[in-house]
Amino acid sequence: MNNTTVRIATRKSALALWQAEYVKAQLEHFHDGINVELVPMTTKGDIILDTPLAKVGGKGLFVKELEVAMLEDRADIAVHSMKDVPVDFPEGLGLEVICPREDPRDAFVSNTIKSLSDLPQGSIVGTSSLRRQCQLKASRPDLDIRDLRGNVNTRLRKLDEGQYDAIILAAAGLIRLEMSERIAQFIEPEEMLPANGQGAVGIECRNDDATIKALLAPLECATTRIRVLAERAMNRALQGGCQVPIGSYGVISADGKNIHLRGLVGSVDGSEMIESEITGPVEEGEALGNKLAQELLSRGADKILQQVYSENDIKNS
């Protein structure tokens, strides 16, 4: 029996609560008698819905309140979508566990159109992501890309009301919320490179909390960690915040020995796109991510990102 209580800081959205409940169930599975409590809270990113994410501080807005709760000992762990987690952590906190990854692809969602390629000229497509906007405009400059904020249900409601012809969401969120029937098309990484960590759930805790770390250990997925840390290393080396047109995606070979990592940096209007890829031993995943970033920088990625930051008034956090 384990009489320990673990308090999970979580946002209140349906998807965030699903992730927290998943971690709760896993902890209860591995530790008989453990007491797990959810501590739901509202983040700044949940409140400011009338401004594009990039202009109000990127996706770090969705984790800061949860981190403060841990530092003030109001919670023991925080559960995050890895694509929302900034590459650097506050002093005293760290990424302890990365859980098994769900489908990392983006999803094309429409009530009337079957796929991205079937969109009529000038169609209105909703997304809050500059990464998605960049890649959409590169392949389909005719599309009218409009900002789309809110939780999954809010975004789907806006689509159903006719505000958009289609919207792009992370497939993982729809699958987890048992809404995969809303997905008209899974967009392959070759067509739209995902965000670093997309589809993965991470668990953050205090670095000095040995008891919590021991309890979390069975939830770790080693292969997901290799992939996600390689992707995040590329993002860190590019000094890219969560809300910039950067895509990165790692795949481990069938024999488990190598990782193939792809990355891209583009302008928001899709007129410029720099892409590259690299393969090497899984043990060198983060080094490969750094190397891939240097390759992109040597080809002008830094100039594109500087322009993106200035033109879009992006706060890099």
UniProtKB/Swiss-Prot annotation:
Main EC class the enzyme belongs to: transferase
Comment on bound cofactor: Binds 1 dipyrromethane group covalently.
Gene Ontology MF terms in the entry: hydroxymethylbilane synthase activity
Pathway of action: Porphyrin-containing compound metabolism; protoporphyrin-IX biosynthesis; coproporphyrinogen-III from 5-aminolevulinate: step 2/4
Swiss-Prot/TrEMBL keywords: Porphyrin biosynthesis, Transferase
Catalysed reaction equations from the record: 4 porphobilinogen + H2O = hydroxymethylbilane + 4 NH4(+)
Modified residues (S-(dipyrrolylmethanemethyl)cysteine): C242
Keyword Oxidoreductase: no
Subunit structure: Monomer.
Family statement drawn from the similarity comment of this UniProt entry: Belongs to the HMBS family.
Protein name as it appears in the record: Porphobilinogen deaminase
GN (gene name): hemC
